[in-house]
A protein has these predicted regions:
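Membrane-embedded alpha-helical segments and adjacent helix-loop junctions characteristic
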Residues: 1-81
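Long, highly hydrophobic alpha-helical transmembrane signal-anchor segments
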Residues: 19, 23-31, 111-125
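Juxtamembrane and boundary regions of transmembrane helices in multi-pass small-molecule transporters
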Residues: 20, 72-98, 107-111, 128-166
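Transmembrane alpha-helix interface/packing and boundary motifs in multi-pass membrane proteins
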Residues: 42-52, 99-111
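Re-entrant/interfacial helical elements at transmembrane boundaries that shape
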Residues: 54-68, 108-123
């Protein structure tokens, strides 16, 4: 419970910094496929060293912040309903890619997912031994997940592929 309290307070205090970082990313990277891939890779990397739930909580915080910006723009008539709906769909796409990234990265190391701690404890493995022994399974899964992200965005499968208007 104490970990949860620290996690929530850290995210709350870092919200503005995270919003600035992600705003710069959205302004700099124009390709939705590249942006989606960046979110998957970033979430996977962070989840390899932090609990996947913590990384997901950070993604949710940033997504809610952007949603509030879209909502404020819509209510003040700066954007129309269609742009607002596209913005929501864009955020949902990015959020889902980030969530998949946390799962992909979380399975690679001992700290990423809680069940990995149990597996490593029962097998007597340390951090790097867990990584090396699980790599024949986890690395192909990670690569497959990255390829799926690109293909889903490229071919707009399952209503993915929404772009933000300028």
């Amino acid at each position: 419970i104490l970990l949860l309290v620290f996690m929530v307070s850290a995210i709350f205090f870092m919200k503005n910094l995270l919003m600035v970082i992600f705003t710069k990313l959205l302004q700099t990277i124009k390709s939705k496929i590249l942006l989606s891939l960046l979110f998957v890779i970033s979430a996977a990397f962070l989840s390899a060293f932090l609990d996947a739930l913590t990384v997901t909580a950070v993604l949710i915080t940033v997504t809610i912040g952007f949603y509030q910006i879209f909502e404020k723009s819509y209510k003040s008539n700066e954007i129309n309903k269609s742009e607002f709906e596209h913005g929501k769909s864009f955020l949902a796409d990015i959020m889902m890619h980030g969530a998949v990234g946390t799962a992909l990265g979380g399975v690679c190391t001992i700290v990423g997912e809680p069940q990995n701690l149990l597996i490593a404890d029962k097998a007597g493995w340390e951090f790097m031994e867990f990584f090396y022994r699980m790599a024949p399974v986890t690395m192909p899964v990670l690569v497959s997940g990255l390829i799926c992200c690109v293909l889903i965005e490229r071919f707009k499968v399952f209503n993915y592929g929404f772009e933000l208007s300028d």
